[in-house]
């Protein structure tokens, strides 16, 4: 429901955003429910970019898939997780409950968001990593079988089979990632230092009212050196070469977390996003009027292109 509320800002009234396809209990056969957004949309004009990666799942994928299928905006990042199941809860006599999977979500063009249930289902993300999918677009496996090939409103080819494939691929940036960084980051030491530093310097930090003022001050505090000393006290040995390679990354995170502790999320995101290549790519697409965004309003013509979506979705039903 939250996804529908958000997407109502981007599409005209009555346009089908996604389909919930599944087997309904107490009924025989299959049932198809199209969910329609009611009420006037607020943002039918203007460019839209949706950011996704391998951790984007469920409602995020429904939103991204609908935006992509209607050619309403550009999807930027990496292939999404592939989670599109619907569960219904049944209360038992002893007050316990069972949740039964009854449906799957499909995008307007008919693509099934849920990844296939195979024996190695739980290893999917790991297999993507081993295959190099996070780092090179040509390493992404796409099943181009006719049954998994679909068309967007403007006739672009998109593929089903699980998850949403972005229009613009952005690889993971590992240029500043080192074993040292992974150790201090995964152990929570960056967060811990940021809290400790904020508490120790709260009287000074509270003087800064804007992100720019706070970031300018923190840039002069040699945070990386102070942090590595802190980490050494937590039994993480210094690795000079690795620290030098990861310095900018570490300092960016430290400044962002300190800003969050001081100014809240209004201070956190502007600093953190300076290292976000996916966001930068999306902004470039918007600023340069990427070709997909030249035709950015949902019209009756787009609606007509999907007038037979019910048949498409039923033909591709997987239960």
What kind of feature is each model-predicted range?
Residues 2-3, 7, 13, 34:
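Intrinsically disordered, low-complexity polyampholyte segments enriched for Lys and acidic residues
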Residues 112-113, 117-319:
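Conserved functional hotspot residues or short segments at active or partner-binding sites
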Residues 1, 22-186:
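Conserved acidic, small-residue-rich alpha-beta core segments centered on
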Residues 17, 22-25, 288:
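Local alpha-helix boundary/kink/capping signal
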Residues 11, 16-19, 31:
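Short linear motifs in low-complexity or flexible loops
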């Amino acid at each position: 429901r939250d996804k529908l509320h958000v997407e109502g800002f981007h599409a005209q009234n009555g346009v089908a955003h996604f389909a919930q396809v599944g087997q309904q209990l107490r009924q025989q056969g299959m049932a198809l429910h199209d969910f329609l957004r009611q009420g006037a949309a607020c943002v039918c004009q203007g460019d839209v970019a949706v950011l996704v990666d391998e951790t984007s799942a469920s409602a995020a994928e429904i939103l991204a898939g609908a935006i992509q299928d209607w050619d309403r905006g550009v999807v930027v990042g990496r292939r999404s997780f592939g989670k599109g199941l619907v569960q219904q809860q049944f209360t038992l006599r002893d007050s316990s409950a069972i949740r039964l999977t009854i449906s799957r979500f499909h995008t307007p063009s008919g693509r099934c968001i849920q990844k296939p249930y195979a024996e190695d289902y739980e290893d999917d993300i790991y297999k993507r990593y081993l295959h190099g999918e996070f780092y090179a677009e040509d390493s992404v496996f796409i099943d181009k079988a006719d049954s998994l090939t679909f068309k967007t409103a403007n006739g672009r080819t998109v593929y089903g089979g699980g998850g949403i494939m972005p229009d613009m691929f952005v690889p993971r940036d590992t240029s500043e990632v080192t074993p040292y960084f992974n150790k201090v980051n995964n152990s929570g030491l960056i967060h811990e230092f940021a809290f400790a530093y904020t508490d120790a310097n709260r009287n000074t930090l509270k003087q800064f009212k804007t992100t720019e003022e706070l970031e300018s001050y923190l840039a002069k505090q040699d945070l990386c050196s102070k942090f590595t000393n802190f980490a050494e006290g937590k039994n993480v040995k210094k690795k000079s070469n690795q620290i030098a390679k990861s310095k900018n990354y570490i300092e960016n995170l430290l400044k962002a977390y300190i800003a969050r502790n001081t100014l809240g999320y209004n201070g956190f995101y502007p600093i953190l996003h300076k290292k976000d290549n996916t966001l930068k790519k999306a902004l470039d697409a918007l600023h340069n009027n990427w070709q997909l965004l030249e035709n950015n309003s949902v019209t009756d013509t787009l609606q007509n292109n999907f007038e037979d979506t019910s048949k498409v979705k039923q033909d591709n039903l997987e239960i």
